[in-house]
Amino acid sequence: MDNDKHLKGTTTVGIVCSDGVVLATEKRATMGNFIASKTAKKIYQIDDLVGMTTAGSVGDAQQLVRMISVESKLYKMRRQESITIKGLTTLLSNILGGQRYFPLMVQLLVGGVDKNGPAIFSLDAMGGNIEETKAVATGSGSPMAYGVLEDRYHEGINVDEGMELAVRALYNAMKRDSASGNGIDVVKITADGYKRIETGEVDKILENLK
């Protein structure tokens, strides 16, 4: 099948903070050189305090979201507690690894807060699973995003600072990567809850960058 005929999501960012994590994505989905969607959803809530970002094939990513959301709910029903983020990503890694001959074309970030504190893991299409200790980006705009993240990340960053940094990183990626654009979604997760940031608040941050 022609790979250009698949819907693809692009740039995502994750930042580990002192008091939680920040996950952020832009909203464009492409099909080859065609902008197929300007409102693509790329951040999904998997558990009360866990989110997942997706880059790559939209269909493959949505399949994984459905699978892992169900597994997370089943774990909670059986154990009366949430699965750890490391446990969740190990399960995802096993699913992806089992598909290695017919790979699901995705890059994933799974982040949140559990009994071990804030954490973000990145996963590739083959099931490679890395715990990120600072900041991470995936997708076609990640080289530009990394330039900002490497320059501005600092130890002890809090979620409000992390939110501003994530928006700045995506803003720079969107300026140079034609497959990224059409606005930014941001989620911050702390021990107090999972919060999707209002568009107006994101727009205020963007205005200060221009």
UniProtKB/Swiss-Prot annotation:
Classification via Pfam families: Proteasome
Gene Ontology biological process terms in this record: proteasomal protein catabolic process
The keyword Transmembrane belongs to this UniProt entry's keyword annotation: no
Activity regulation note: The formation of the proteasomal ATPase PAN-20S proteasome complex, via the docking of the C-termini of PAN into the intersubunit pockets in the alpha-rings, triggers opening of the gate for substrate entry. Interconversion between the open-gate and close-gate conformations leads to a dynamic regulation of the 20S proteasome proteolysis activity.
Active-site residues from the entry: 10 (nucleophile)
Chief location bin: cytoplasm
HAMAP family given in the database record: Proteasome_B_A
Family: Belongs to the peptidase T1B family.
Protein name: Proteasome subunit beta
Species this protein is from: Methanohalophilus mahii (strain ATCC 35705 / DSM 5219 / SLP)
